[in-house]
Structures are given as C-alpha cells and as structure tokens.
Amino acid sequence: SPEGGADKAGHLYTSYVMTRAFTGLYQHWGDDQRSAGREALFTSLLLTGIMELGDGLSPYGVSGEDMIMNVAGSLIGYQLATRENWARRLDLRMEYRPGGRSDPFTDYEHARYLVAVKLDGLNLQERSPLRWLELHAGYYARGYDDPLQRDRRHTYVGLGVNLSRWLDRAGWAGSARLLRYYQIPGTSMRADHELSP
C-alpha cells in the first residue's frame, strides 16, 4: 500500500475501537453483553462499509484490503467485547507521537499498532510482580510520506508496564479504560526488526 501497510493496520484498529465503543454504548442503553456486542459488530461493519464506499467516490477508490481489515477489526472487537477472559488478557492499541499532520487517524508516519498481552490476565498469583507487565508485538511504517526518506516497515516485540491496571487500582477507571486502546509513547522497551522492502 502507499503507506507501507500502516493504513491497513489503521483500518483494523479503527474498526476494532468502533466495535468496542458501540458495545459499551448499547450496554449503557440496556442491552446485555452478547446482544450489545452483536449490534456493535454490525454497526461497525455498516459504518466502515459506508466510509469505504465514500472512498470509492474519491481519488482513493474502494479497497478490498481495507474492507478485509475493517471486518477483521470488527470481529476482534466483538470477540473481546463478549468474552471477558479474552479482554482481561489482550488489548489492541495505537501508539501515537504527534507529528506533522493534525489527524492521528491518518498520520501513519507517527503511529504504531500493537497487540498487548496482559500478564495479569493469565491468572498469576496476586503477589507475582509479573502481573504488572505486558508483552507487546507491533507494526509500523516510516518514510512513506516523505520523498526524501527511505521507505521502511518494522515489526517489534516489547515489554511494557500495565498502566491500565495501575490506574484502575488507583481509582482512575476512565483513564484505565483509555489505556486499553492507547499506548503512551516511551512506556515500553522494544526489540525492533526492519522488514526487507
């Protein structure tokens, strides 16, 4: 893709977040967890489908790959919204360090997308210090927006601190929820691997 695949990761992430957000909204309106998740899945698919059709009227055109990533993100969102044991263990997040564009949803040059495995969700003993840690695996692309830079794609693995657990235990539940979707830059150690062109 013209963004090194970061735009596809962005589609997956955005549809995932939409599904999770609509699940919460529908539960707030009185639906049970399973019904709310199902309705959120269909809402996310409908909205991302409409957006993709809108792209068809623009110079971007309709992208089958975007649609696949929208479906995948919505399905992952549904799984995590309706299965507590999965949600305790996994997060999909975006790490964003503001840069040239004002829109973090299309500024792929300054974004990273990752899966976080939360060790406290693996039924560790309450006294184990490992419960405060997370394992990360992610992807990002650089240079695709700047003709003076070489295009680069990266995968990485890392170790992070479960900040949402810290905030939740400190009574900051709203902030803890936000950090299930957003990775604060500089809060993990990473081993980076550049993919061949």
Region annotations inferred by a language model:
Residues S1-P197:
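Hydrophobic alpha-helical membrane segments
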